């Protein structure tokens, strides 16, 4: 389903369904036992984001394709692309850090049983500079950070080494399945 939200000229709502991989003897058995996951995805662009910057951003269908294999539950996600000022304001307001960061995830689930619902905010100038500094294609860096944000939305974190290893392993596996290199290979 594709629906334009007329009250937001810069938003598109897209609903997709994905099937998690299942171990089965053949494809028919796998499909019969597979649970369908649903993603309600909205993409927004900050008002101050310049038109030239918007042209370099991933398309809705790409974002959908990157998030789907990283989902382990139904999800309602909003991906928002912002300029440096909005990114810095959000990081300062919600994390007490007075600088723009590459990605922020605001998860609205209060318990593990709550549905996955979150805003994933990407600061375009920071993402672009990081990709340049790290010698990575911008598309690959956006894919990585969007998958990273989707995992945060589902409760994954990287506060300690064991958590980081688990989360980075999932990111690497998802990105490899999408044809992107290991984002942590150069460490």
From Swiss-Prot:
SUPFAM superfamilies, sorted: Metalloproteases ('zincins'), catalytic domain
A Gene Ontology molecular function term of the record: metalloendopeptidase activity
Keywords, in A-Z order: Cytoplasm, Endonuclease, Hydrolase, Metal-binding, Nuclease, Ribosome biogenesis, rRNA processing, Zinc
Cofactor(s) the protein requires to work: Zn(2+)
Protein's cellular compartments: Cytoplasm
GO (cellular component) term, any one: cytoplasm
Residues annotated for Zn(2+) binding in this entry: 148, 152, 158
Enzyme Commission numbers on file: 3.1.-.-
Pfam families per the UniProt record, alphabetical: YbeY (PF02130)
Chief localisation class: cytoplasm
Gene Ontology BP annotations: rRNA processing
Keyword Manganese: no
Cofactor binding mode and count: Binds 1 zinc ion.
Similarity comment: Belongs to the endoribonuclease YbeY family.
Role description: Single strand-specific metallo-endoribonuclease involved in late-stage 70S ribosome quality control and in maturation of the 3' terminus of the 16S rRNA.
Protein name: Endoribonuclease YbeY
Organism expressing this protein natively: Ralstonia nicotianae (strain ATCC BAA-1114 / GMI1000) (Ralstonia solanacearum)
């Amino acid at each position: 389903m594709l629906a334009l939200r007329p009250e937001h000229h810069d938003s598109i709502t897209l609903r997709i369904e994905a099937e998690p991989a299942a171990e089965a003897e053949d494809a028919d058995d796998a499909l019969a036992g597979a649970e369908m996951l649903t993603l309600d995805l909205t993409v927004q662009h900050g008002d101050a984001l310049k038109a030239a910057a918007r042209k370099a951003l991933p398309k809705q269908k790409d974002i959908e394709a990157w998030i789907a294999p990283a989902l382990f539950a139904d999800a309602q996600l909003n991906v928002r692309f912002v300029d440096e000022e909005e990114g810095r304001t959000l990081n300062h307001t919600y994390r007490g850090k007075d600088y723009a960061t590459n990605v922020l995830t605001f998860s609205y689930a209060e318990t593990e049983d709550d549905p996955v619902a979150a805003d994933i905010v990407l600061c375009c100038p920071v993402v672009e500079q990081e990709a340049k500094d790290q010698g990575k294609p911008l598309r690959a860096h956006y894919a990585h950070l969007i998958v990273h944000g989707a995992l945060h939305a589902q409760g994954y974190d990287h506060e300690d080494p064991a958590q980081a290893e688990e989360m980075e392993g999932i990111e690497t596996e998802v990105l490899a399945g999408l044809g992107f290199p290991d984002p942590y290979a150069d460490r």
